[in-house]
Amino acid sequence: MKTYVSNEYDVIVVGAGHAGCEAALASARMGEKTLLLTISLDMVAFMPCNPSVGGPAKGTVVREIDALGGEMGKNIDKTYIQMRMLNTGKGPAVRALRAQADKWDYHEEMKRTIENTPNLTLRQAVVDDLIVEDGECRGVVTNTGARYRAKSVVLTTGTAARGRIFIGELNYSSGPNNTIPAIKLSESLERLGFKLRRFKTGTPPRVNRHTIDYSKTEEEPGDKEPRHFSFTSRDEDYLTDQTSCWMTYTNPKTHEIINENLDRSPMFSGDIVGVGPRYCPSIETKVVRFADKDRHQIFLEPEGRKTEEIYVGDFSTSMPEEVQLEMLHTVAGLEKVEMMRPGYAIEYDVVDPWQLTHTLETKRIKHLYTAGQMNGTSGYEEAAGQGLIAGINAALSAEGKPAFTLGRDEAYIGVLIDDLVTKGTEEPYRLLTSRAEYRLLLRHDNADLRLTEKGHDLGLIDDDRYAEFLAKKELIQEDLDRLGEITVHPTIAVNEYLAGLGQTDLNGGVKADVFLRRPRVTVEDVERLTGQKLAGDRYVKEQVEIDIKYAGYIKKQEIQVARLRRQEAKKIPKDIDYDQIEGLATEAREKLAKIRPETLAQAERISGVNPADLAILSVYVQNGKYAKVQK
């Protein structure tokens, strides 16, 4: 096809899913002339699977995105239909906010934000090729022949990259939700020498809400207490008219139908070769893998206020359409349900993430960044977090400024990216709280304290919001100091209160911060018992209470972080030749040469690099032997 020269930009972002939207908005807000290209303008920030945002670890990522100046938290706070805090009976490190989204409102609101953002142009196009000159990415070529040039390019192709949908024996080339797949871009990446692999994900059927017998299901209402993802959202705007979700279960009859039709499932017939997600398996995989279980939970989740579609959560399947309906009709409450869309599996290309740096720039081609599901992750939140970092770094690169990264001790986003680039992934990667060594420091409640200053330095947090943040920090310190001054006396009221908690009496006066360390004692109780009011609002008080109650554990993790930072400060030269280092185990040598860690701390986290290998490497890097092993 004949090509033509179109416009020139500072940054081009390919794909307008959750990663692409954050990347493009970050770049434009940092002052870069940005082009956002998407296969379909009707799919901007679309939710092809679960109509929700947040959950364990993921919810904290959304708060981190917001603290850095990203959009996902604001967007869901404008478009949710239900909000719930999960794990409220557990410690603060694992509490998680989850919102049920109106997926159509979410898409429309994000598209409106993008269209109204200065420096940002949104266009519909399929990108077929990259413009690469002297090992640097300098633009893209679309299927209509347009050549757009740029200083940096961010790819966020999601599941559209050579996507193929499977429904029983039927399979066809497609992106998510029957959109156009991106075929030639994958071929372009392979020609450039990138290693691609196939992953698989899936989605459940959607059913008509009016054909469900809700009397046979369990209601899951939203929280009455105001909750928000964005630190800028106000309690007075909290939605009181929330939409419930509903829970039901599969049963032995459901499992019998699944087992009888496994030969028709592309997951088991061999038609699907892509690796599926461990933590979000299809219902047929769950039935086979957990054959001892008589039932599995199913969540019925509304997709929005203006649609009749209900998402059948935890029921992902690629069975033939008629088998899906037969399966649904065995479930309590769904005996007469009408299916509006069948579930399907989708295979797609991913870039092996060891080919990336911590900035999400590719090692092979300079000024080319990748983010989202094409890096091997699953989930909207993981994608958005990567997109934000890739967009920030694409903008910084366009300006010739130093790159921006987040450490494992600074954010779940840092954990996610570090896991990808130092360990790679053999399956769709899902962020879990257990992946974070310092999760007590990386909480839902303190994301602003960790990251707002960084967002302000990048130009993504405006001065007004930054001033509010500084005022909050001052109030936290003021209330911490105040609790160190207030005395709680052993009054009758105090000891009756303690008896009600099953605790021993107070024999003498103690400072309020010491009293607050007792289990189940709250800041509000201290205020009531002493008659002394603190200055902060409920969010400040929450922070104060956590800081005091968990001070010892937080201190331990801060000591561990100090050790990590010492190791991170020990840089490994880029041109080191691992073949010349004597004593390294073969596996360690191969892994180090493949991943090429930037610091000793990163090398330590690579699977296959043992302590002995690390000690040898450390000697070469730190003790003057490096010159002997230069390439």
Swiss-Prot record:
A GO BP entry: tRNA methylation
Binding site residues for FAD: 15-20
Protein's name in the database: tRNA uridine 5-carboxymethylaminomethyl modification enzyme MnmG
GO molecular function, one term: flavin adenine dinucleotide binding
Main location: cytoplasm
Subcellular location: Cytoplasm
Function: NAD-binding protein involved in the addition of a carboxymethylaminomethyl (cmnm) group at the wobble position (U34) of certain tRNAs, forming tRNA-cmnm(5)s(2)U34.
UniProt organism field: Lactobacillus delbrueckii subsp. bulgaricus (strain ATCC BAA-365 / Lb-18)
Binding positions (NAD(+)): 276-290
Residue ranges of the region described as Disordered: 214-233
Quaternary organization: Homodimer. Heterotetramer of two MnmE and two MnmG subunits.
Cofactor requirements of the protein: FAD
Record's keyword terms, sorted: Cytoplasm, FAD, Flavoprotein, NAD, tRNA processing
Family classification: Belongs to the MnmG family.
Keyword Flavoprotein: yes
Pfam families: GIDA, GIDA_C_1st, SAM_GIDA_C
Record InterPro entries: FAD/NAD-bd_sf, GIDA_C_N, MnmG, MnmG-rel, MnmG-rel_CS, MnmG_C, MnmG_C_subdom, MnmG_C_subdom_sf
